Design a protein with these regions (language model features):
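Short N-terminal segments immediately surrounding and downstream of signal-peptide cleavage
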Residues: 28-49
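Boundary at the C-terminal end of the N-terminal hydrophobic targeting segment
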Residues: 21-26
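A short small-residue
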Residues: 27-32, 98-106
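Acidic/histidine-rich alpha-helical segments that form the ligand environment
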Residues: 105-153
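Short, contiguous alpha-helical
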Residues: 41-45, 52, 61-102, 137-178
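A non-catalytic, amphipathic alpha-helix used as a structural packing/dimerization or gating element
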Residues: 42-46, 50-53, 117-120, 124
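Bacterial N-terminal signal peptides that target proteins for export
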Residues: 1-20
Length: 178
């Protein structure tokens, strides 16, 4: 009987030692938490990439409106880019771009012009986040979060433009197998 108890104790000790080693290994392998600027940059770039994919993917009918009272597809993208520059001009203390709430269509006549303006606003935002680092991002954290959310809200609006046009938004399409 003592032999059985001893065997059980040895086995239990080995199991516990292996569990402790596995737990320690898992803790060592866990990635470091993101810094504030890394988290803001990741979110900014994620929604920016989604918007740019939509902007590139949308047919050339950039004047399409859900209803007569709403902005056109182009105007939504211009509004996003202009708002991005409103933020960037304030946090950087310099005029980085056209920060009007609704830049006029006449200033951005083609799909390529609109996409380039949107892309530049997103790229400039990412560069500003990196330049500011954690201290700068934390100083303007409410702004960065608010404007990133603003991009996300308009992304959702553009999904409605896709659906109303019987199109499937890029992020809702089946993933291509590799």
């Amino acid at each position: 009987m003592i032999r059985i108890v001893r065997s059980i104790l040895v086995f239990a000790t080995l199991v516990l030692a292996n569990l402790a080693a596995a737990s320690l290994h898992a803790q060592e392998a866990a990635p470091a938490p993101k810094t504030p600027s890394q988290a803001v940059l990741e979110n900014w770039n994620d929604i920016g990439k989604r918007l740019l994919t939509m902007a590139d993917d949308w047919p050339d009918n950039y004047s399409y409106k859900l209803t007569p009272a709403t902005r056109s597809f182009s105007q939504v993208l211009l509004h996003i880019a202009g708002s991005n520059y409103d933020l960037l001009n304030r946090v950087s203390g310099t005029k980085m771009g056209d920060g009007r709430n609704d830049p006029p269509d006449a200033d951005y006549k083609t799909k390529a012009d609109v996409v380039a303006f949107l892309k530049k606003s997103i790229d400039d935002g990412a560069a500003e986040i990196q330049k500011e680092g954690d201290a700068g991002v934390l100083k303007h954290l409410d702004d960065w979060i608010g404007y990133t959310e603003h991009m996300g809200e308009h992304y959702g609006l553009l999904v409605a433009y896709y659906r109303a046009s019987n199109l499937v938004p890029p992020s809702s399409r089946p993933k291509k197998s590799q």
